[in-house]
């Protein structure tokens, strides 16, 4: 939601589509998103699965380390039928990340939304947002991120993600590889 919050602060209308558990954490997250002025009509609640929890620790060098309580998490359970297509079709830019493709159910919902956004003429924005503990394998992560790269008009990517996708430590060389491939 960081991208949405920043766009909202710049005066743009934003909306979030996703799923949280019908629990205190889910309500807290939705309230925090609403406080940023982000439309939450696309949020769905799951009575049977808890909200995914993420814990972030900052190391002395400033690097972040993530731990997750998930598997399943409510975000993984968003189905294509639950995607609010009116929000998608009204978007000028549709932003997504790879975490919405870690499981088949939410991957189908993501692909459904992207197809609708493209059909409506929206630009597609993608943030790989690689969180290694959430993937079954790094091959699966690479495959899904590669698909996301092939779909996007706008890319928000980190140095680590460039290296992960290209094998290049040099950012300029890695970026060139991404441009050439996608």
Q: What kind of feature is each model-predicted range?
A:
Residues 2-13, 58:
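Alpha-helix C-terminal capping segments
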Residues 120, 134-182:
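Conserved phosphate/ATP/ADP-binding segment of small-molecule kinases
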